[in-house]
Amino acid sequence: MELTPAQEDGHVVYRGIFTAPDDVELVWYHFRLSWADGGTSCYGKNGLCAWDAVEPWQLTVYDDTHKTPAWFGRGVTYQIFPDRFRRAKSRDVAGLVGPRTLHDNWDELPEYRPNSEGEITCSDFFGGDLQGITEKLDYLASLGVTTLYLCPIFEASTNHRYDTACYERIDPLLGDEADFRMLCAEAKKRGIYVMLDGVFNHTGRKSVYFNADGFYDDLGAAQGEQSPYYRWYNFHPFPDEYDAWWGIKNLPAVNELEKSYVDYIIEGDNSIIKHWLRAGASGWRLDVADELPDEFIAKIRAAMNEENPDTYLLGEVWEDGTTKIAYSQRRKYLLGRETNGLMNYPFRTALMAYLLGGGAEYFRDSMEELRENYPAPAFYGAMNFLSTHDTPRLLTILGLTSPAPQTRDERAVYQLSDSDLARGMSLLKLAALILYTFPGSPMLY
């Protein structure tokens, strides 16, 4: 590329035109300087240095054909763990996939420790429901909330519901599809959009699809090749050994690109993606997006755009989404044909490092690099947060002045001391100030 010199304010400024590639990809660049004495230097992110030490800048070439919906990133996102938000009705767990234990007292502590067999069953429920969320919409609107992000609401055997038992049904403890439609309709009246959590890398072991314990009448993959869902899973050998998310047997992994699965989740006339958008949802958050093939995510984006171009697709990615490599593949989340934006874990990581005593320069430089790397719609449409259901509460981290509890028994009863709580609250207020003034949608959990 040829650079043309020009005089500006007593300085020589060099300009050149670079033609970006025709297709989406990442481009790295630096400047090479040839001196009058025959020497050569390079200039990059780390300043003037030798050619073998230069750190190049990144240019993200992306497709801006599909615009990011204007409603996301302009207000507060409120994350709800449905079982623990608000209980409007008393319900019964009898006959539901489980087992389940229902707490009568909303203020009881959940069971955090493993059972006698060493298993964390997540089987105690408190009965929060969709009607309870609907009843608090005025309160949420008063907080400036414009997006409700709901953790999984579909039928499942655990309280977190990331072990989907049936994508077609709302978990009965939460209500039914009519309750969901009412929630979305009432939220829309208040300028609030509802985002669902899509768990499509794995299902539950206790599900219509896998049916390991035979709870459901239909044949699941665990019943053999005669099941319509058998090809969704990889057995080696059948029936006891199978691929599972991080080896957790309760979460058998699916073959995302199996045609019948793609049709069921994405491309069928009444696919899961389309059905729940028609029921009132305005977006999907993709759980463990780095476990999903790029092709699968792109199909979801295409189906959503076809159904309603004003919908938002968010990905759970814990690193810089433009440079992320998963399973030896550089991912394409933010190149314009997959997610609209990502959960901003790099923001939380850098902010936490600063609040725990690191230099402000690290936070500034990390966020500036993210701003340079991300397409503008993705940077300003990111979901920023201090804590989620997948992280320790930031208040606890900021308040700790002694080593954190290590065992589950210790964690089950741990509380910050009064002095640690006061320290944590002071730092948390500073964190909130940064969160609510940073580009993107601040998320409250």
Each model region followed by its residue ranges:
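Active-site-proximal substrate-binding groove within the catalytic cores of carbohydrate-active enzymes
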Residues: 358-445
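The feature marks proteins involved in alpha-glucan
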Residues: 2-81, 85-115, 125
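Substrate-binding/active-site clefts of carbohydrate-active enzymes
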Residues: 81-146, 153-279, 300-307, 323-324
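Short alpha-helical segments and helix-capping/turn motifs at coil-helix boundaries
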Residues: 15, 61-66, 133-136, 298-300, ...
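Short, flexible loop/turn elements at secondary-structure junctions
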Residues: 5, 18-22, 35, 81-84, ...
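Active-site-proximal helices and loops of the catalytic beta/alpha 8
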Residues: 181-193, 201-202, 207-218, 272-274, ...
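Hydrophobic faces of well-ordered beta-strands that scaffold small-molecule active sites
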Residues: 76-78, 148-150, 194-196, 284, ...
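Short amphipathic alpha-helices and their capping/turn segments at secondary-structure boundaries
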Residues: 66-70, 134-144, 184, 370-375, ...
